[in-house]
């Protein structure tokens, strides 16, 4: 699963998921899926969607993951009283803003790409839309 090899600090403030997205255009592939909602994706969700896409296109073409889980999320164990410090890092998330391209595909027909992305979207916690590369 995706997670940083090393970070300057182990734990991070929760923060707020506001603002505009970077990476709003299909850059590497021909087709992609773009987030419509604001939210966060865990490393497990990113990997599950990647596997679904790879299997749906039968390992043809190429897949790019445009999001990376770089924010640690901590949790305290069950039945532990409040206080006594911040909990342990349990998983990593990527904060997603509307318009962010999540995955890209190249080397497959459009219909196969649409089908693969439709299957992958069911694994994700936010709504997405299908986008194609615009050539100027």
Swiss-Prot record:
Ribosomal protein in keyword set: yes
Family (UniProt): Belongs to the universal ribosomal protein uL16 family.
Molecular function GO terms recorded: rRNA binding; structural constituent of ribosome; tRNA binding
Gene3D superfamilies named in the record: Ribosomal protein L10e/L16
The protein's name: Large ribosomal subunit protein uL16
Gene name for this UniProt entry: rplP
Quaternary assembly: Part of the 50S ribosomal subunit.
Function statement: Binds 23S rRNA and is also seen to make contacts with the A and possibly P site tRNAs.
HAMAP family: Ribosomal_uL16
UniProt key word tRNA-binding: yes
Species this protein is from: Buchnera aphidicola subsp. Acyrthosiphon kondoi
């Amino acid at each position: 699963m995706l997670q940083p090899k090393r970070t300057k600090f182990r734990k991070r403030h929760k923060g707020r998921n506001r603002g505009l997205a970077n990476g709003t255009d299909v850059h590497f592939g021909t087709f992609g899926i773009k987030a419509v909602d604001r939210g966060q994706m865990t490393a497990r969700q990113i990997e599950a969607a990647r596997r679904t896409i790879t299997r749906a296109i039968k390992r043809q073409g190429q897949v790019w993951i445009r999001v990376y889980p770089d924010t640690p999320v901590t949790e305290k164990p069950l039945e532990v009283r409040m206080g006594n410090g911040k909990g342990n890092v349990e998983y990593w998330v990527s904060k997603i803003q509307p318009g962010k391209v999540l995955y890209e595909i190249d080397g497959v027909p459009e219909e196969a790409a649409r089908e693969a992305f439709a299957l992958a979207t069911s694994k994700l916690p936010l709504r997405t839309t299908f986008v194609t590369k615009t050539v100027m």
